Amino acid sequence: MSMDTTILVEIGGLLRAARKGLDLTQEQVAEMAGISRPRYREIESGKSAARTSTLINIARALGLELMFIPQPMVPAVNALLQPHGSDDDLPAFVASSNGDDDA
């Protein structure tokens, strides 16, 4: 499997996990993203690359934001996103798992 194919499959897997986590069908995501279901299926399966604008629309349909992070910053961003010992240790921008609003 080529590096490009591996990346497409990885992106598709992330999209699939996000979609299933929201209990959405491929049809629903495709409609919200403004593409056909067959096109969405190809992207989610990693069989086809997508334009950046299409990925942005899909991500937003799934409540995600596509971001480009400078490579030297990736370790720091990954560290921020790693779970810690308790909810008190979560960065301020991560939703608490208990659903309480302190504001």
Give a label for each model feature.
Residues 1-10:
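A detector for short, charged/polar N-terminal pre-domain segments
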Residues 20, 34, 45-47:
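Residue-level detection of the helix-turn-helix DNA-binding "recognition helix"
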Residues 38, 49, 78-79:
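Short Asp/Glu-rich motifs
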Residues 13-28, 57:
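Short basic helix-loop element that most often maps to the first helix and adjoining turn
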Residues 24-41:
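Short alpha-helical DNA-recognition segment
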Residues 13, 40-43, 50:
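Helix-turn-helix-like N-terminal two-helix hairpins of bacterial/phage DNA-binding regulators
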Residues 69-103:
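Short, charged recognition helix plus adjacent turn
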Residues 46-60, 67:
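Short, basic-rich loop-to-helix N-cap that marks the start of a DNA-contacting helix
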